[in-house]
């Protein structure tokens, strides 16, 4: 994965696209003009500009102005098993030690991230408003990062779920307008890229043909549900009991059949790879290795597996040799440290 400044990335992509002929205009759309029931004729802008098009990409965020508000795309909420619906964010300065990784740390009613960038550290606390107020969540984050009085925090509301059909008529919803799964696995950009690539492929094959459109919508929906299952498992398998938030997550039985199948397979010694491939027609979002890491990482082993003695004759890891090899590889790269002022 990469650490990047989302604002600067947007500027870079804008410049990259315009240099290659993409027309970039800053206009405020105030209304949507419909043609047929399931198609858009034009966007009407504040300055009187009327923008016609063959395909309209709805990137209007959680408002989903075209897909949901105009075309009536159905929204499917995920609140029954993904409780978090808020985030409080607050950047901080680098400490003396510069970390080359994102930290994800459990909190009383959710979890927080710490992401090092070259000029600052991004911090955020993802939580459920059912279990903690905005004020208390901000106070908890400030205490955790040692910024009780510095900086201005922002509260972000999250609408967690997806629309039933990402491609409706001549509108493609992308980003927050098509759906959002909380950022625990940082999957938002992946879904946007997959949506763009799959749409281009489907459109080139069949234009507005309903067959290709239906298959595209099914693939995107399956991707959302596959990611959802994996993230829900993080909460369902937790073994904390210090707050009601974590107790309710551990007791939550609103699980999909696929997730129940993966948990059952793990505890009954089935082949996770076979089960995973079968559930997703050979194309799962998370490989079986990821599921192994998740289950084992939570220490959720079948009871008998905990008492089985370690087999003899196993090859022991040559830790010192591995450490020397990695150190030698590191000499090929610049030292990972913040840019000097």
List PLM regions with ranges.
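Predominantly flavin-linked oxidoreductase catalytic cores and closely associated redox partners
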Residues: 1-143, 196
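Generic, low-specificity signal for short hydrophobic/alpha-helical stretches with a mild N-terminal bias
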Residues: 96, 123, 153-159, 174-181, ...
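FAD/FMN-dependent oxidoreductases across multiple families
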Residues: 118, 127-239
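Short, surface-exposed, charged/polar-biased interaction segments
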Residues: 34, 77-78, 83, 109, ...
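Short conserved micro-motifs at the rims of enzyme active sites and ligand-binding pockets
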Residues: 100-101, 126, 183-186, 305-306
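A residue-identity detector for tryptophan
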Residues: 16, 111-113, 167, 246, ...
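Tryptophan-centric aromatic hotspots in well-structured domains and transmembrane helices
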Residues: 2, 55, 111, 167, ...
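Long, low-complexity C-terminal extensions of enzymes
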Residues: 201-341
């Amino acid at each position: 994965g990469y650490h990047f400044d989302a604002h600067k990335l947007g500027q870079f992509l804008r410049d990259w696209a315009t240099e290659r002929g993409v027309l970039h205009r800053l206009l405020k759309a105030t209304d949507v003009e419909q043609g047929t029931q399931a198609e858009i004729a034009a966007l009407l802008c504040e300055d009187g500009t009327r923008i016609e098009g063959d395909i309209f990409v709805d990137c209007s965020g959680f408002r989903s102005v075209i897909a949901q508000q105009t075309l009536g795309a159905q929204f499917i909420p995920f609140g029954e098993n993904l409780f978090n619906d808020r985030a409080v964010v607050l950047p901080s300065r680098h400490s003396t030690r510069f970390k080359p990784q994102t930290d994800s740390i459990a909190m009383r009613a959710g979890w927080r991230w710490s992401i090092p960038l070259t000029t600052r550290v991004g911090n955020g606390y993802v939580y459920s408003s059912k279990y903690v107020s905005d004020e208390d969540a901000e106070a908890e984050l400030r205490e955790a990062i040692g910024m009780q009085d510095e900086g201005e925090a922002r509260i972000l509301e999250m609408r967690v779920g997806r629309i039933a059909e990402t491609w409706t008529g001549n509108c493609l919803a992308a980003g927050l307008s098509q759906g959002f799964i909380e950022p625990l696995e940082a999957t938002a950009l992946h879904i946007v890229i997959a949506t763009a690539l799959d749409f281009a492929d489907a459109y080139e094959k069949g234009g507005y043909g309903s067959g290709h459109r239906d298959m595209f919508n099914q693939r995107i929906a399956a991707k959302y549900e596959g990611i959802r299952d994996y993230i829900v498992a993080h909460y369902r398998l937790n073994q904390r009991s210090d707050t009601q938030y974590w107790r309710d997550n551990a007791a939550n039985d609103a699980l999909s059949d696929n997730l129940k199948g993966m948990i059952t397979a793990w505890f009954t010694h089935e082949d996770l790879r076979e089960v995973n491939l079968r559930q997703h027609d050979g194309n799962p979002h998370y490989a079986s290795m990821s599921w192994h890491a998740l289950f084992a990482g939570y220490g959720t082993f079948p009871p008998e597996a905990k008492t089985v003695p370690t087999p003899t004759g196993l090859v022991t890891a040559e830790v010192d040799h591995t450490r020397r090899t990695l150190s030698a590889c590191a000499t090929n790269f610049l030292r990972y440290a913040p840019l000097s002022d």
